Amino acid sequence: GGGAAVTGGAVGAATGLRGAGPTPSTAQLDEWQAMVTQATEPHALAQLRTLARRGSGAAQAALGIALVDAHEPGLRDEGRSWLETAAAADSKADAPAARRAQLALGKALLLGSGDLPKDYARARALLGAAAEQGDPAAAYYLGLIYRSGYGIAADPVQAAHWFDIASRADIPAADFMLANAYRDGSGVPRDDARALALYRRAAEHELPEAVQTLAMAYRNGELGLRPDADEFHAQWIETAHALKHPVVAP
């Protein structure tokens, strides 16, 4: 189970919750997760460890997400161990926690995290499981895997399919990737109007790449737009603004 890699602070966990007690709310778990992520706060860490050891999938996922990028290698290992445990849960009650853990672990294995080596095949399996259960962020990362061919032959049709699912959930980065697909006719029929609408939507969320793409389209008269120096200038200023306020990755 996830308790195999427990490091210092375990002793204090036993004093956390007396008896079984009521299950903490999602908001409480989220708060503890944030406290552990930001400052490895001992009380929050002890509470989550106690619940995780008792088999709470939600606590296992929260603890894993909080620790997977920790500075201390022992805590990172513990985080990964809890994510593995939560991701493997197959009960209906633990399904939302399993999805969160699959996304977090899949992202870590896709992008690399600390000393964790990339493992594209495992990342694809985890993100695929979460995406099939309706997690839009997992769908976005699955789209990236198929678009770029990470550990697998590139598949533009699959990439566009998963970007479309993520885009419908209002993920600006997915809007941008799907817009590129429509612009290039990559995995979907070429459609400048659809691409333009998606670029605009991503730009409204201040995604710098989308704002910059619109600026160049106005400058060069692309995507069915007429060249427009004023619009180009306005979008260029907006690009600088967007770069100062980066969109949080899904």
Feature-to-residue mapping (PLM):
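TPR/TPR-like (Sel1-like) alpha-helical repeat modules
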Residues: 197-208, 212, 216-219, 226-245
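N-terminal leader/linker segments that initiate helical-solenoid repeat arrays
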Residues: 1-54, 58, 62
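Short helix-capping/linker turns of helical repeat alpha-solenoids
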Residues: 40, 53-57, 69-71, 89-92, ...
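Hydrophobic face of amphipathic alpha-helices that form TPR/SEL1-like repeat modules
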Residues: 34, 62-69, 102-111, 141-148, ...
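Structural signature of tandem alpha-helical TPR/SEL1-like repeats
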Residues: 38-45, 73-82, 116-126, 153-162, ...
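Amphipathic alpha-helical repeat scaffolds
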Residues: 29-37, 49, 65, 84, ...
